[in-house]
Amino acid sequence: MLSYRHSFHAGNHADVLKHTVQSLIIESLKEKDKPFLYLDTHAGAGRYQLGSEHAERTGEYLEGIARIWQQDDLPAELEAYINVVKHFNRSGQLRYYPGSPLIARLLLREQDSLQLTELHPSDYPLLRSEFQKDSRARVEKADGFQQLKAKLPPVSRRGLILIDPPYEMKTDYQAVVSGIAEGYKRFATGIYALWYPVVLRQQIKRMIHDLEATGIRKILQIELAVLPDSDRRGMTASGMIVINPPWKLEQQMNNVLPWLHSKLVPAGTGHATVSWIVPE
């Protein structure tokens, strides 16, 4: 089942949260000269036209990136991420949104590498064309969850693994946990960043319970809700679960989340939280 297209949702509040966390982790990894791997299990098309029929049909970016990218009081924690967005929109008009692979491409250094996977028959060729001239990147049409077995550990023994499946199938909620467990067996020092949507809170509670049962330590949860939990409204919140987070990430997100919530949710509904699922 491959009906999900991220082009309908690019630049929404969930992307803002995901890419804020992604960029902060990458910037942290760059503090050491040693190279690292960026592995993206569900990479998407790479770049999204916000004037496309898909994006215009939902207009989700108007309540996401459009609300923050030109703010004068932008927190320092958002600079790396927003600078990438501005790089793709030099005219000052918000026309393109960079997905996680393009954010990584701009932030990574010459010595770092990218391993990108996408299975969707329409998105894979777009992703491949984005990276055809980038010698640091390897793009594959494959099952993203299998990459957690096949591509780990990296030679450098340093890396960020971003896992953000579409959750089209309910089994994805179990697949992310088993995939992380497999990856962790091979690469216990890697940073794993798992994105999740809150559609039914019970699914997330079950997923977190299963993750706790793996015995993995150092699991940080970051969540941004635009509406209260509901079983009728679709996605009301999204979150990032980070295993082995950089030591600064908790404080950075505590600094920036209240600002993001105030800009993205002017009505003040929902919540913004940073908490440990499992401490060290």
Swiss-Prot record:
Any GO molecular function: RNA binding
Residues under site feature: Interaction with substrate rRNA: 4
GO biological process: carbon utilization; rRNA base methylation
Enzyme superclass (EC): transferase
Reactions listed under catalytic activity: adenosine(2030) in 23S rRNA + S-adenosyl-L-methionine = N(6)-methyladenosine(2030) in 23S rRNA + S-adenosyl-L-homocysteine + H(+)
Protein name, UniProt field: Ribosomal RNA large subunit methyltransferase J
Miscellaneous: Recombinant protein prefers protein-free 23S rRNA to ribonucleoprotein particles containing only part of the 50S subunit proteins and does not methylate the assembled 50S subunit. Recognizes a minimal substrate corresponding to helix 72; this shows that RlmJ requires only a small hairpin for activity and this suggests that RlmJ can methylate A2030 before the 23S RNA is completely transcribed, processed and folded. Cannot modify single-stranded DNA having the same sequence as H72.
Family named by the database record: Belongs to the RlmJ family.
Pfam hit, one: RsmJ
PROSITE patterns referenced in this protein's UniProt entry, alphabetically: N6_MTASE
InterPro entries in UniProt: DNA_methylase_N6_adenine_CS, RlmJ, SAM-dependent_MTases_sf
GO cellular component, one term: cytosol
SUPFAM superfamilies linked: S-adenosyl-L-methionine-dependent methyltransferases
Binding site for S-adenosyl-L-methionine: 19, 42, 100, 118, 143-144, 164
Residues at the catalytic site: 164
Species of provenance: Escherichia coli (strain K12)
Keyword Transmembrane helix on entry: no
Function text: Specifically methylates the adenine in position 2030 of 23S rRNA. Nascent 23S rRNA seems to be the natural substrate. Appears to be not necessary for ribosome assembly. Required for the utilization of extracellular DNA as the sole source of carbon and energy.
Disrupted gene: phenotype observed: The inactivation of the this gene results in the complete loss of A2030 modification, but does not cause the accumulation of ribosome assembly intermediates. The phenotype of rlmJ knockout gene is very mild under various growth conditions and at the stationary phase, except for a small growth advantage in anaerobic conditions. Only minor changes in the total E.coli proteome can be observed in a cell devoid of the 23S rRNA nucleotide A2030 methylation. Mutants show a stationary-phase competition defect during coculture with wild-type cells.
HAMAP family: 23SrRNA_methyltr_J (MF_00934)
Subunit structure: Monomer.
EC number: 2.1.1.266
Keywords (A to Z) from UniProt: Methyltransferase, RNA-binding, rRNA processing, S-adenosyl-L-methionine, Transferase
